[in-house]
């Protein structure tokens, strides 16, 4: 459960990310593919090389979904319902991969924001990404 303070920090963080979210989404995916190569199996039709337009496009979608969730912090489940259906019923992505991507997104934020990514902000965004991962996995049950 996100507290009022968590929500405030998440919103502040996303304001810092504004203008870079597509690049951060792309970088998080690239990092995931390198760090967890087994995740590539879900993208057999993608060119997964660095700089790939397909990965960049998917990174943009990831960032847009996170932005949508940030705008709907009081109802993340409703905001991501269609995405949850897509990943559970059509794509059949193993839910552990949502956590792997979340971890990679955290690393990208820390690398780019440095001291502006405070420990409190990190903790709040970690809770947020855990909530997003849980919502994306809820249709699997």
From Swiss-Prot:
Please name the Pfam families in this protein's record. Globin
Q: Which CDD domains match?
A: Hb-alpha-like
- Protein residues bound to heme b: 58, 87
Q: Which GO terms describe its biological process?
A: hydrogen peroxide catabolic process; oxygen transport
DNA repair recorded as keyword: no
| Keyword terms | Heme, Iron, Metal-binding, Oxygen transport, Transport
Gene Ontology molecular-function annotations: haptoglobin binding; heme binding; iron ion binding; organic acid binding; oxygen binding; oxygen carrier activity; peroxidase activity
Describe tissue expression.
Red blood cells.
The UniProt entry's coiled-coil ranges are none
Q: Which PROSITE patterns match?
A: GLOBIN
> Mind telling me which InterPro entries this protein's record contains?
Globin, Globin-like_sf, Globin/Proto, Hemoglobin_a-typ, Hemoglobin_oxygen_transport, Hemoglobin_zeta
Listed GO cellular component terms?
A: blood microparticle; haptoglobin-hemoglobin complex; hemoglobin complex
Q: Which residues belong to any copy of the Globin domain?
A: 1-141
Assembly and interaction partners: Heterotetramer of two alpha-D chains and two beta chains.
Q: Please describe what this protein does.
A: Involved in oxygen transport from the lung to the various peripheral tissues.
Q: Which family does it belong to?
A: Belongs to the globin family.
What is the name of the protein in this document? Hemoglobin subunit alpha-D
* Organism of this sequence: Aythya fuligula
């Amino acid at each position: 459960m996100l507290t009022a303070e968590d929500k405030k920090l998440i919103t502040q963080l996303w304001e810092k990310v504004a203008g870079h979210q597509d690049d951060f989404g792309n970088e998080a995916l690239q990092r995931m593919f390198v760090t967890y190569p087994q995740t590539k199996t879900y993208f057999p039709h993608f060119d997964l090389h660095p700089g790939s337009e397909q990965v960049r496009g998917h990174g943009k979608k990831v960032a847009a979904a996170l932005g949508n969730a940030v705008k709907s912090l009081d109802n993340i489940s409703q905001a991501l319902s269609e995405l949850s259906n897509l990943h559970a019923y059509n794509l059949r992505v193993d839910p552990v991969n949502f956590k792997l991507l979340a971890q990679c997104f955290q690393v990208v934020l820390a690398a780019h924001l440095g001291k502006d990514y405070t420990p409190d902000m990190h903790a709040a965004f970690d809770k947020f990404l855990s909530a997003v991962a849980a919502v994306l996995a809820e249709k699997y049950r």
